[in-house]
Each structure stands twice: as structure tokens, then as C-alpha cells.
């Protein structure tokens, strides 16, 4: 089976402005797409990457938002992307809380495994882990990438993981992440 490079993106803090501490973004009017997102998405697609959003949304398990509310928010996000000539190839959500003992909540790699299965089933390709990355703004995102066996970019922090055969970068935002990843792939 052919393998292809994939970019996995956390949502809050990478795609959109993060919510205030202990709050959740559940409505479109609170969803502020960060500068450079569409430019980064276009750069990745132009260079042969598939792009998936992988996001923990425990607001669902806590009853703060329904799955359909989050789906609607993501529908509006993808429509906004389309108006700006960019897109993602899929969105994978963990609706569970910390103590639900699921396989999908980051730092577990379940969301990335779901995306991999989607690629294998729908396109007959798999993830090339040596050329794939997760971009996130938390240690949990970075740990998920390490647990899945891919390279990581931590936005706004210092990488925790070192010397495990993978690349670990830092960046100010998604656009700088794209430039660093693409610069290193040439």
C-alpha cells in the first residue's frame, strides 16, 4: 500500500483562538480563525500532504455542547475555509472526558489511527509516519504524535520529547510550522 505524508492539526490554539481557561468554543460567533491558517493549509496541500484535524472536545461528554453543535461549528469552519480557497481532508473528534478511558483522547493516538483507517479504506493509501507531523499547542498534542510515531511541532512552547528518532520543532503559529516543515522536507 502506498504511503503519503499527513499533517494532523489540533484545533483550538492552532486553527482558531483558544477558549479562555475552563471554557469551550461551541458557537460560530466565538470561533476566530487565526491568521495564516488558510495559507498554511494551501502550502501543505500544494506539497502533497493530506490534512486532518484531530481534536479533543470533552465539552460534549460534559453536556456543555452536543455532537451536532460541534459538527455544525465544523461545517461552518469548512465553509469559511472554502470561501478562502483552502480545506482540510477530514475532522476527527474525541468527545470523551479525562476519565472515560477511551482510545481516542489525546495523548492516545486513536484519532490519528481513525484518520489512517479512513485513508486506507477510502483512498487505498496509508500514513507515511516518517514524513507526517502533528501540530499542536499543548504537551498532550506532542505526546499524541510521539505515541503515534510521527514528528511534532509545538506552537508556543519548548518540545518535551527529544532523541527518539523523530523531529520535534517549535513555532509561533501554523504558518511558521508549515514553513519549517516544508523547508526541512526539501
Question: What is each model feature region?
Answer:
Residues 74-93, 163-182:
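Structural recognition of alpha->loop->beta junctions
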Residues 62-78, 103-117:
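Short, electropositive alpha-helical surface patch
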Residues 1-50:
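Active-site neighborhood of HAD-like aspartate-dependent phosphohydrolases
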Amino acid at each position: 500500500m502506498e504511503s503519503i505524508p499527513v499533517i494532523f492539526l489540533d484545533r483550538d490554539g492552532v486553527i482558531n483562538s483558544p477558549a479562555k481557561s475552563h471554557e469551550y468554543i461551541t458557537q460560530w460567533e466565538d470561533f476566530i480563525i487565526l491568521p495564516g491558517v488558510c495559507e498554511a493549509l494551501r502550502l501543505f496541500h500544494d506539497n502533497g500532504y493530506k490534512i486532518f484535524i484531530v481534536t479533543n472536545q470533552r465539552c460534549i461528554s460534559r453536556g456543555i455542547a452536543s455532537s451536532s453543535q460541534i459538527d455544525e461549528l465544523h461545517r461552518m469552519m469548512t465553509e469559511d475555509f472554502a470561501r478562502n480557497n483552502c480545506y482540510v481532508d477530514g475532522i476527527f473528534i474525541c468527545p470523551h472526558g479525562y476519565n472515560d478511558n477511551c482510545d481516542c483522547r489525546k495523548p492516545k493516538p486513536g484519532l490519528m489511527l481513525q484518520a489512517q483507517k479512513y485513508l486506507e479504506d477510502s483512498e487505498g493509501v496509508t500514513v507515511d509516519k516518517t514524513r507526517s507531523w502533528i501540530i499542536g499547542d499543548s504537551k498532550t498534542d506532542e505526546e499524541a504524535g510521539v505515541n503515534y510515531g510521527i514528528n511534532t511541532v509545538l506552537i508556543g512552547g519548548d518540545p518535551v520529547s527529544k532523541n527518539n528518532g523523530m523531529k520535534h520543532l517549535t513555532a509561533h503559529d501554523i504558518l511558521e510550522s508549515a514553513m519549517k516543515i516544508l523547508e526541512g522536507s526539501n
